Amino acid sequence: MTRLVVPRIALLAAIQLATAPAEAAAFGPPPGAELKLEKLDAIESFVDGEVAAGRIPGAIVLIQQHGKRVYFKCFGKRDVDAGTPMTEDAIFPIHSVTKTITSVAAMMLVDRGTIALDDPVSKYIPSFAGMKIGVERKDESGKTVLDPVALRRPITIEDLLLHTSGITYGFYGVGLVKAAYGGIYLGDFDNAGFVERIAKVPLAEQPRTLWDYGHSMDVLGRVIEVASGQSLYQFEKRNLLDPLGMTTTKFFLTDPGERARYAQPLAKDRHVERNSLNVTRWESGGGGMVSTVADFERYGAMLLNGGTLDGRTYLSPATFKAMTTDHIGPGAGVARNYYYYPGDGFGYGYGFGIRTDPGNASPPAPGSLGEIKWDGATGVYLVVDRAEDMLFVVMQDSPSGRMHVITTIKKIVYDALEK
């Protein structure tokens, strides 16, 4: 099998440039627009209202343009029960935004030639060689059963990056494959143990046929461990987090001082699957990290600068371009499961939603062509818009109220951009 490293990435970058949407000139704010600070005042009245209504405990909003903070404010409480005000050093569970960090770490290994996009996952996790699709049928008694069906081709590293591996989540949707994920989180396990559990669950569909949100990034985290000879956190800490100054971004909080800074959700939202105050051996590359607004400002700045920051290159230009290319658009032969899909007008790159067109809404949802974004179950939200030389971060621990908060703030931000 030909190794798809830099040549494959360079080809993808060329395709992106050749197929840029014609609507680019007509959609979104004009390139070079500036944020009108007085219009950003609407963020304060909106978030204060959400806090006062008891819909969220608090939040932090940061907006940067041209390398400088143009808006920063802490709202509400870090811990409502204790009456602790929100502070800049509050630590938040970032849940699925972890996936973007895992993707960046994996692409750093691709840049180095350590792994390749077309490597079969079974090269690093041998048990994946025996995986099958689970296809439902009715038996003679009328009972629904699963038939194992062979894969048309192996799952690859690129499939993990694109959520096209056939690996899904069991906590949404119906069917016997979904039900097979029951009990997958029980007991004590590390990344090696978790992927062996995944290997025993039937795939939901053939690889590269459906964008299906699931445990692909957890499997990718284990690939990083095997390929690097380090734990996932060790590799990320040494190669990405520490060099960027993201010193509070980690999987678990063991230091008493850091644990005291953990942003607590409202009582109604204390049902999420993972709690970063519970220290286990599982470093979930799909949703296990915590972070701060300062760390995410650094991370966003690196992405805004195309994979470099302060003279250090984390991703080569070709690799960054490939990460921010839509790989599941028209002609890719990939359908979309819209549960957890990044939204109308978006495609998907390696770990990020990519704005590819205005979408079907009239007027279009706010944003710019080429913007990259992702968010997590608690409402942590990162948007990087290179056309406007802008990034913004929302930090919150508000599972039930998160979407209204992030969509409203995004509209305020883009409404504030004027030429």
Question: For each of these PLM feature ranges, what is it?
Answer:
Residues D41-D48, V61, G67, P93-Y124, ...:
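Active-site SXXK
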Residues P126-P366:
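Short, surface-exposed loop or secondary-structure junction motifs
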Residues R8-A20:
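Bacterial N-terminal signal peptides
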Residues P31-I94, T114-A116, G130-D139, V272-R274, ...:
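Short, conserved catalytic-motif segment at the N-terminal edge
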Residues Y381-D385, D389-S398:
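Short, well-ordered beta-strand elements
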Residues A22-A26:
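Boundary at the C-terminal end of the N-terminal hydrophobic targeting segment
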Residues M1-L4:
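N-terminal secretory signal peptides that target proteins for export/translocation
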Residues I406-K419:
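Surface-exposed amphipathic alpha-helical segments
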